[in-house]
A protein has these predicted regions:
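N-terminal export signals
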Residues: 6-25
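Terminal, non-catalytic domain-edge segments
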Residues: 26-67, 92, 139-142, 165-175, ...
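Extreme N-terminal leader/anchor segments
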Residues: 29-128
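Hydrophobic core segments within long, regular secondary-structure runs in both alpha-
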Residues: 45-49, 53, 87, 102-121, ...
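Aromatic- and histidine-enriched alpha-helix N-cap/loop-to-helix transition segments
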Residues: 74-88, 149-163, 228-236, 290-298, ...
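Extended ligand-binding groove/face enriched in aromatic
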Residues: 97-228, 274-276
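Extended ligand-binding clefts on enzyme/binding-domain cores
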Residues: 183, 190-205, 209, 213-357
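Solvent-exposed beta-strand/loop surfaces of large extracellular or lumenal domains
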Residues: 501-523
Length: 541
């Protein structure tokens, strides 16, 4: 498997005039995602969420289990990607499984945004901004460096930051990042430089600067590293603009996406007429890179939001190319030397190692297009051969740099896949991110909500009866004998609220019930060693 630098150096002839181009938003197959709150989280999914919450709660500067094989935050498993995909996983859980309990995930999500602003996450850009002949063949001299990580290029960071902030605002109704200076980058090394550098943004100014750059680069998107526009990295700012439009009642995405579509149609489309998935465009050379790397599974998963019919049309072909069945019946990423030989016709030795998060990208893509059979086989491989580990109740897969075991089975595990992407794939539903894109919340769901839970794991929380009732599932934490404590918010003071144990159908039966006292702020708290799994909170008077 070529690494990203290999893709940049490889190049390919431009493929103008090919393909049907990009489908407009809202076209394609009908959305197939289940109704929010229909599906409860299971033990494994809940453990993934616990791990993400554990990492989000780490002190600033503590990057436990997040160390990358690359020392400069330049590779595909850098902190920025781990933080972003952990946040997106929380977002998927909030939207699809816990729509009546989003507040329970707001703190970890916000903490991930805070970590995204730390210097060790984005300071690589000061050196990267100089470019070089590996990124820009024929470059005569390095550019003057700049520190601001979002003012120009670097969409591989700024696009994810914008998507995180926009998703946070849409899901939790918190406008804190609309405040001037709420997204501030501080660069103040102790031993060098001419003093502190500060670059202040907020949600609105960050989005505005990114949209301006789309126009500056002829509507094809914004470069990641200098001179290279990667298709996948530009999908996340498009998502972000969609989320903000939903909340603000604006329509900024439609003209932006229309221009993006026209620009790429003129070059054959991001999925061209030969069904090649475009990886990147070298700007100055106007060269398209379409090497069929399994890393493009990430691109397909992201494009499913607004061109699902095209993505599904090519997914079967790429699943056969990128995935390989093992003797045990699991699926792994096809070994890099086999992929290279298939793509180029040039055999290479089996020593070519795995070095990208391709397994995680494939899991993300399969979860989004709803290929449950292949996804299950891929996850089964991870569970059998990639050391699933539980720590403080959280499930993750620790980093392993060794490519294969003695039997040739893939054992390579990067921290992006192990901390975030397999969690994302498990918690996602078919068309999961597409559902957020097509049906973003214009406001937080109204009515009562669950705001905190201790002593138990919340598996599902959904509004019923027009938002006036909560139905939720709890499972007591096996490792503790502490009572279950549940905090509620947005309860109407003066009304009588009743909590009832229900059957699996959600209807009150022979289960116990109790009246819940509500304070003047519309909040309530219960503490009980209750043992049932499903409950219903409703106003009865």
């Amino acid at each position: 498997m070529m690494d990203r630098r290999g893709f940049l150096a490889a190049g390919a002839a431009a493929m103008a005039g090919l393909g049907a181009g990009l489908a407009q938003r809202a076209r394609g197959e009908d959305l197939r995602a289940p109704s929010p709150g229909q599906l409860a989280l299971d033990d494994v999914q809940s453990a993934h969420l616990r791990h993400i919450s554990n990492l989000a709660a780490m002190p600033d500067g503590e990057w436990r289990h997040m160390g990358s094989i690359d020392p400069g935050q330049e590779w595909l498993d850098a902190y920025r990607y781990q933080l972003a995909f952990m946040a997106y996983t929380l977002g998927l859980a909030a939207y699809h499984h816990l729509p009546a309990a989003t507040e329970t995930l707001r703190g970890p999500f916000d903490a991930l945004i805070g970590k995204m602003l730390r210097r060790e996450v984005w300071a690589y850009w000061r050196a990267t901004s100089q470019s070089g002949p590996r990124l820009d063949p024929g470059l005569a001299a390095l550019r003057e460096p700049w520190t601001d990580p979002v003012v120009r290029e670097n969409i591989m960071y700024s696009g994810h930051l914008l998507a995180m902030v926009a998703m946070y605002r849409m899901l939790f109704g918190d406008t804190k990042y609309d405040t001037a200076g709420s997204l501030t980058f501080r660069y103040d090394p102790i031993f060098y430089g001419k003093g502190p550098e500060t670059y202040a943004y907020d949600h609105g100014t960050l989005q505005r600067r990114i949209v301006e750059q789309f126009a500056e680069f002829h509507d094809l998107g914004v470069p990641c590293e200098p001179n290279n526009i990667f298709v996948v990295c530009n999908q996340y700012p498009l998502l972000a603009v969609r989320f903000r439009d939903a909340v603000d009642g604006t329509e900024h995405l439609d003209p932006l996406l229309a221009s993006y579509r026209r620009a790429w149609d003129a070059r054959g489309g991001v999925i061209d007429g030969r069904d090649s998935v475009i990886w990147s465009l070298m700007v100055r050379q106007q060269r398209l890179i379409d090497y069929p790397t399994p890393d493009s599974a990430w691109t397909l998963g992201a494009l499913n939001c607004w061109m699902p019919d095209r993505v599904r049309a090519v997914s079967g072909r790429y699943a056969k190319l990128w995935l390989k069945e093992t003797a045990e019946g699991t699926l792994q990423i096809r070994p890099p030397h086999e992929l290279h030989a298939m793509a180029t016709g040039t055999p290479v030795g089996p020593a070519m190692p795995y070095r990208s998060p391709a397994l995680g990208y494939a899991a993300l893509w399969l979860s989004e297009v709803g290929d449950r059979e292949r996804l299950t086989a891929l996850l089964d491989h991870a569970d059998r051969f990639m050391q699933p580990t539980t720590e403080h109740g959280g499930l993750f897969y620790p980093r392993v740099d060794r490519s294969t075991d003695a039997a040739g089975r893939m054992t390579y595990m990067d921290p992006l896949t192990g901390n975030a992407l397999l969690a994302y794939a498990r918690i996602n539903v078919i068309d999961g991110m597409r559902a957020l894109y097509e049906r973003p919340w214009t406001a937080r769901p109204s009515g009562p909500s669950i705001v905190a839970v201790t002593g138990a794991t919340l598996r599902r929380a959904v509004h019923r009866d027009g938002g006036q009732t909560i139905e939720f599932d709890l499972v007591a934490d096996a490792a503790t004998a502490a009572p279950i404590v549940v905090g509620f918010g947005a309860l109407t003071p003066g009304r009588t609220w009743q909590l009832t144990e229900t059957g699996r159908g959600g209807r009150a039966g022979d289960g116990r019930s109790a009246r819940i006292p509500v304070d003047a702020r519309g909040q309530a708290r219960i503490a009980s060693a209750i043992g049932a799994q499903r409950y219903r909170l409703e106003a009865v008077g």
